[in-house]
């Protein structure tokens, strides 16, 4: 194991400017999470208002997740070319427009309540997902230039906790708003928060230390020592010709089925199976602990990866998949509400461990700062394509087989993901030799 002395010791000014950069970026992404997962809290309200079954609601979910997945794959190279800051601004303001448009769907009664209205909601939510797909690409692209490979695990944990704060807010706001206000406010409120964070991103975020007036430094990732020109050929070769990145992409497909199968449907499961209103104390407390577990999972994953596994990501992801398998078995058996809540909490922890390690960190490591967005697009895109099946597909399954089929449908995917991580257990990014130099912006410790 490498000694922690391999970590760079940055100047105070560098740390201050980087802090302003990643705090703004992280909370902007958290706001976008609110505008992505709010649909799960309007799921039952939409069904009750318009008389739709789970398969019809699932159509909206599938359209959105499919478009997100495909868009992330194709927008990754674009974000690598235009930079993360521009990509985030495109994403956040697009998401503002289409969250507002989804809420305004409450006032288009002339479409009726049948296929035309479903088509409207599915189209608008798919467009929201297109712009949402820029968010992860932008986040990883910017951070890949600001964080050394030996810092990324822990800082990905910090980012993971910030992102989960957006999820926590929509758990609280969504649950209360859908009960006290018309359902459309579950979309209007996140739109307003995203707009504020978009303007802060414009003001504070910069793509690299150099753009913020700081000296550059060697991040020691897959781009280290790489002087090739960044073009489409370079990006595709860097990511698609790498067996490690393609194996991670396959694992992320499995992650998507489990993650979205859980996150898109668990509020409705609690309402219909456990008979808990979204505003109830038990649901609110349980949802809070689920989010807290996600935050804890990101911290456990980042710390274990950097300090126990020498900045290797697959071993930690394997543990996350194993946790998911155990928890989904408990959900399948459904021994009682306390057990179900406990399984939800640990499942959230396991999902967060995998997500922060693969989409959040391995993409920077194996894509390098030059191709980080392309790698993220591939990983995140495959995750959402895998998740697309939990929309209409899961809706059909639940309509025909009931909630007893929910847990078992996700177990096999978690198992395949765990086996793929065993295959990559010792994988680390390859580096090109670079000229010996003292990294600018890094204050070396005195000998």
Regions found by a protein language model. Name each.
Residues 311-361:
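C-terminal transmembrane helical hairpin of 12-TM major facilitator-type secondary transporters
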Residues 81-92, 306-321:
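Cytoplasmic membrane-interface "Motif A"-like loop-to-helix N-cap segments
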Residues 93-114, 322-335:
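C-terminal ends and interior cores of transmembrane alpha-helices
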Residues 39-43, 242-299, 355, 359, ...:
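Extracytoplasmic gate region of multi-pass secondary transporters
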Residues 124-165:
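Cytoplasmic helix-loop-helix junction between adjacent transmembrane helices
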Residues 37, 65-73, 167-168, 291-299, ...:
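Residue-level signature of mid-helix packing/kink "hotspots" within the transmembrane helices
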Residues 159-210:
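Helix-loop-helix hairpin linking two adjacent transmembrane segments in secondary transporters
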Residues 2-15, 208-248, 438-447:
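Juxtamembrane intracellular "pre-TM" segments in multi-pass secondary transporters
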């Amino acid at each position: 194991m490498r000694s922690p002395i391999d970590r760079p010791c940055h100047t105070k000014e560098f740390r201050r400017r980087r802090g302003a950069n990643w705090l703004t970026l992280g909370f902007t992404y958290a706001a976008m999470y609110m505008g992505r997962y709010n649909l799960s809290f309007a799921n039952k309200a939409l069904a009750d208002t318009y008389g739709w079954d789970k398969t019809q609601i699932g159509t909206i979910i599938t359209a959105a997740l499919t478009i997100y997945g495909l868009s992330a794959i194709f927008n990754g190279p674009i974000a690598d070319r235009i930079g993360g800051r521009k990509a985030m601004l495109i994403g956040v303001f697009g998401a503002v427009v289409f969250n507002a448009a989804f809420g305004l769907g409450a006032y288009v009664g002339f479409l009726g309540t049948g296929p035309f209205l479903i088509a409207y909601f599915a189209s608008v939510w798919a467009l929201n997902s297109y712009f949402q797909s820029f968010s992860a690409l932008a986040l990883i692209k910017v951070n890949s230039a600001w964080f050394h490979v030996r810092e990324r695990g822990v800082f990905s944990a910090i980012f993971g906790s910030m992102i989960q704060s957006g999820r926590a807010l929509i758990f609280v706001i969504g649950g209360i708003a859908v009960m006290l206000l018309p359902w459309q406010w579950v979309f209007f409120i996140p739109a307003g928060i995203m707009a504020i964070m978009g303007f802060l991103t414009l003001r504070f975020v910069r793509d690299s230390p150099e753009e913020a007036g700081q000296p550059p430094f060697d991040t020691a990732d897959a781009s280290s020592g790489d002087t090739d020109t960044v073009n489409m050929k370079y990006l595709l070769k860097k990511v698609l010709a790498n067996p490690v990145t393609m194996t991670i992409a396959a694992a992320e497909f499995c992650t998507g089925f489990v993650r979205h199968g859980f996150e898109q449907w668990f509020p409705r499961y609690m309402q219909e199976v456990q008979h808990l209103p979204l505003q109830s104390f038990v649901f609110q407390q349980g949802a809070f602990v689920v989010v807290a577990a996600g935050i804890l999972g990101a911290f456990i994953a980042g710390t274990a990866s950097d300090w126990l596994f020498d900045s290797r990501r697959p071993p930690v992801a394997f543990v996350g998949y194993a946790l998911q398998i155990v928890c989904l078995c408990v959900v399948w058996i459904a021994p009682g509400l306390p057990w179900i809540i406990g399984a939800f909490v640990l499942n959230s922890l396991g999902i967060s461990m995998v997500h922060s390690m693969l989409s959040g960190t391995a993409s920077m490591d194996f894509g390098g700062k030059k191709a980080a967005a392309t790698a993220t697009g591939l990983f995140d895109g495959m995750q959402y394509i895998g998740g697309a099946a939990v929309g209409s597909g899961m809706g059909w399954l639940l309509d025909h087989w009931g909630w007893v089929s929910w847990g078992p449908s996700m177990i096999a995917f978690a198992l395949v993901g765990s086996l793929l991580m065993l295959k990559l257990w010792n994988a680390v990014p390859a580096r090109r030799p670079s000229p010996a130099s003292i990294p600018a912006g890094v204050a070396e410790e005195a000998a």
